[in-house]
Amino acid sequence: MTWIGLLIVGLTAIAVQGEVPIVTRAEWNAKPPNGAIDSMETPLPRAVIAHTAGGACADDVTCSQHMQNLQNFQMSKQKFSDIGYHYLIGGNGKVYEGRSPSQRGAFAGPNNDGSLGIAFIGNFEERAPNKEALDAAKELLEQAVKQAQLVEGYKLLGHRQVSATKSPGEALYALIQQWPNWSEEM
């Protein structure tokens, strides 16, 4: 490799350092929304951690398939206009783009307004997500503050605090209570 090639590679690494890579909707083959979605003003005061409660994924192909299946289910069976969460975290340690943070989510009923929905792909009732997934979520939260998607002093909540659900599962719920910005109250 020439010195110019090394310089370009080095500059690229510097440009992306500190930002969690996000798998875009186009990359996981999302459908477009099938209806209007209410907007929200960002930065948001809350981040809500959930789990999808279904199967987990550990590689790019399987995680993308889970994203497509979840979107199909939420749009056809739950009658949402799009996938309900803003971001999802795969067991491969990657963050998947859901709906825009400036659009109201569809995961917490009346508490969707003002909440950034982040769901881990899988069921985390008995076991926690792996380190790669947990690290990706923590980096995503930091990045969301830097990008003015969340206010600096946002409240971190578990899905069960804003909805009648077991989500994000006992194992994951116990972990997020130790994270920065954790809040007992909305």
UniProtKB/Swiss-Prot annotation:
Tissue spec. comment: In larvae, it is mainly expressed in fat body. Also expressed in uninduced hemocytes and mbn-2 cells.
Glycosylation sites: 181
GO CC annotation terms, alphabetical: extracellular region; extracellular space
Classification via Gene3D superfamilies: Peptidoglycan recognition protein-like
GO biological process terms on file: defense response to Gram-negative bacterium; defense response to Gram-positive bacterium; detection of peptidoglycan; innate immune response; positive regulation of peptidoglycan recognition protein signaling pathway
Family: Belongs to the N-acetylmuramoyl-L-alanine amidase 2 family.
Name of the protein this chain belongs to: Peptidoglycan-recognition protein SD
Organism the protein comes from: Drosophila melanogaster (Fruit fly)
Gene: PGRP-SD
